[in-house]
């Protein structure tokens, strides 16, 4: 009789577990359908690579690109749906998160064509490269929708591990190994700091891990103004600062940019910032709702340091990738203005609009650098002298992207900064906006210095690299140029039609 009762209880428990798993798979699983498409693409790549003796490179690229495009399509089809919380509160789906997921997918879709010829020339393992890119994209997407402390920690670690492996992908390159080691050590330290901050939040809120429940827990425990919350805020700012790479958390950025393969740098330069920005807005806005003045002050300091140091140090650089590294530090200072403004005065809409333009400007610049590097084997700024005489199309494309990064009208970068600064001014961030304007002028100086080198036609200034410049005969070259053309167009034309883009961002968010 006892055995019969125990058997019935076991059957009932098993049925409940099965029904709960079925519910998660059927209902919650549909909320991460774009992510499931990427997972299916990853599995398909692994199966083909492990079962096929011949490596059909175009087929691998097709599977990766198709997975990303299908994921974007699935994301667009569920646009403007009601916000949903799934997986027992671990994941949230809403318009704000989906915009950042769209930006990450867009970055990865544009980055894969940049890597085609580079991988063929350097004879890198193609399957592993694409697997790391897709897995990092998946981690970034989960980070955008993370709704509890555990997911907020695990998702960026998924992205970070793939980033470490990608940065050290050229194992025979000493600079790449050095960059990977610095990246790994500083990334591990920042993750430890972030976990320590989460422990303070967890304890102060009475054992809560969901973001909104942490706020309720802090109210119940009356700990929202306690020293523990201040410590958590400080450590979270340091931990997230590593992902965003503002000054003074920028030490790893120039070395990783210079030592890593150029397509990898292009990927990391945009996806990491998009994912970290999405995470920062949610963490600062929700758990630290009662400490808004404190985190506003911290971010203002980071923004000022980033805009000043990033743009001033960029002037002295001789490597294109190091120059873009310091330029990206300055650019993240502008993005932080939008984070500080927040929901009021269209702060988030201006930040998202500028990030969309920054993706096209930055990836367009890196596409030009990849092409030039493959055809000349150099990354030195002086070696670009006279490029216009050999390849006017590449020189003009690079010039347009650099001018857009500098914020010259009527390019997209100008209108993106104008919208961002206007929102900051309306929110009363006068000092930040003035510093942003001054440092933008500084950035225009070093961008114009490069453009002057590109357009020079005097033989004594043309280096042997440009004098012996030859177009690549590889058919895959078209993929890089296609990505470059898309980015150049996106860096110029959207500036003319700015209002519809702003209207879409505002209508989606609010």
Swiss-Prot record:
Its EC number is 7.1.1.-. The chain crosses the membrane at residues 24-44, 57-77, 99-119, 124-144, 149-169, 183-203, 227-247, 295-315, 323-343, 354-374, 395-415, 428-448, 484-504. It is a multi-pass membrane protein. It is an enzyme of class 7 (translocase). Keywords: Chloroplast, Membrane, NAD, NADP, Plastid, Plastoquinone, Quinone, Thylakoid, Translocase, Transmembrane, Transmembrane helix, Transport. GO terms for biological process: ATP synthesis coupled electron transport; photosynthesis, light reaction. It comes from the Eukaryota. It is found in: Plastid, Chloroplast thylakoid membrane. The gene is ndhB1. PANTHER family: NADH DEHYDROGENASE. Belongs to the complex I subunit 2 family. Pfam families: Ndh2_N (PF19530), Proton_antipo_M (PF00361). NDH is composed of at least 16 different subunits, 5 of which are encoded in the nucleus. It catalyses: a plastoquinone + NADH + (n+1) H(+)(in) = a plastoquinol + NAD(+) + n H(+)(out); a plastoquinone + NADPH + (n+1) H(+)(in) = a plastoquinol + NADP(+) + n H(+)(out). Its main location: plastid. GO terms for cellular component: chloroplast thylakoid membrane. This is NAD(P)H-quinone oxidoreductase subunit 2 A, chloroplastic. InterPro entries: NADH-Q_OxRdtase_suN/2, ND/Mrp_TM, Ndh2_N. NDH shuttles electrons from NAD(P)H:plastoquinone, via FMN and iron-sulfur (Fe-S) centers, to quinones in the photosynthetic chain and possibly in a chloroplast respiratory chain. The immediate electron acceptor for the enzyme in this species is believed to be plastoquinone. Couples the redox reaction to proton translocation, and thus conserves the redox energy in a proton gradient.
């Amino acid at each position: 009789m006892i055995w019969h009762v125990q058997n019935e209880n076991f059957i009932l428990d098993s049925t409940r577990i099965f029904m709960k798993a079925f519910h998660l798979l059927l209902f919650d699983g549909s909320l991460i359908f774009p992510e499931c498409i990427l997972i299916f693409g990853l599995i398909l790549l692994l199966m083909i690579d492990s079962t096929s003796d011949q490596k059909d490179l175009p087929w691998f690229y097709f599977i990766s690109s198709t997975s990303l495009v299908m994921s974007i399509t699935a994301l667009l089809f569920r646009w403007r749906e009601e916000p949903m919380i799934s997986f027992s509160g671990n994941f949230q789906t809403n318009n704000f998160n989906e915009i950042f997921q769209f930006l990450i997918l867009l970055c990865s879709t544009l980055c894969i064509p940049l890597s085609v010829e580079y991988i063929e020339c350097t004879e890198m393992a193609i399957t592993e490269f694409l697997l790391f890119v897709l897995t990092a994209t998946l981690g970034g997407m989960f980070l955008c929708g993370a709704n509890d402390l555990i997911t907020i920690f695990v998702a960026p670690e998924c992205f970070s591990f793939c980033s470490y492996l990608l940065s050290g992908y050229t194992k025979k390159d000493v600079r790449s190994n050095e960059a990977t080691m610095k990246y790994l050590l500083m990334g591990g330290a920042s993750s430890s700091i972030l976990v320590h901050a989460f422990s303070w939040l967890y304890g102060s809120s009475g054992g809560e891990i969901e973001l909104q429940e942490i706020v309720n827990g802090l109210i119940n425990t009356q700990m929202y103004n306690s020293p523990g919350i201040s410590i958590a805020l400080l450590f979270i700012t340091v931990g997230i600062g590593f992902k965003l790479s503002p000054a003074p958390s920028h030490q790893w950025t120039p070395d990783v940019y210079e030592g890593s393969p150029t397509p990898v740098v292009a990927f990391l330069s945009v996806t990491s910032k998009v994912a970290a920005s999405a995470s920062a807005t949610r963490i600062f806005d929700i758990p630290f709702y009662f400490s808004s003045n404190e985190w506003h002050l911290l971010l203002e300091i980071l923004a000022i340091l980033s805009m000043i140091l990033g743009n001033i140090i960029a002037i002295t650089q001789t490597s294109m990738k190091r120059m873009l590294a310091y330029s990206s530090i300055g650019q993240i200072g502008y993005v932080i203005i939008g984070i500080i403004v927040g929901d009021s005065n269209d702060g988030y809409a201006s930040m998202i609009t500028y990030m969309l333009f920054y993706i096209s400007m930055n990836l367009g610049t890196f596409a030009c650098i990849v092409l030039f590097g493959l055809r000349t084997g150099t990354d030195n700024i002086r070696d670009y002298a006279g490029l216009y005489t050999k390849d006017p199309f590449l020189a003009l494309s690079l010039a347009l992207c650099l001018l857009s990064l500098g914020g010259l009208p009527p390019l997209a970068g100008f209108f993106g900064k104008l919208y961002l600064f206007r929102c900051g001014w309306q929110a009363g961030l006068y000092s930040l906006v003035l510093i942003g304007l001054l440092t933008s002028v500084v950035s225009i100086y070093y961008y114009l210095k490069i453009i002057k080198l590109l357009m020079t036609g005097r033989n004594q200034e043309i280096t042997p690299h440009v004098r012996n410049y030859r177009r690549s005969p590889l058919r895959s070259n078209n993929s890089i140029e296609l990505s470059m053309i898309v980015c150049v167009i996106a860096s110029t034309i959207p500036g003319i039609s700015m209002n519809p883009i702003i209207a879409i961002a505002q209508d989606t968010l609010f």
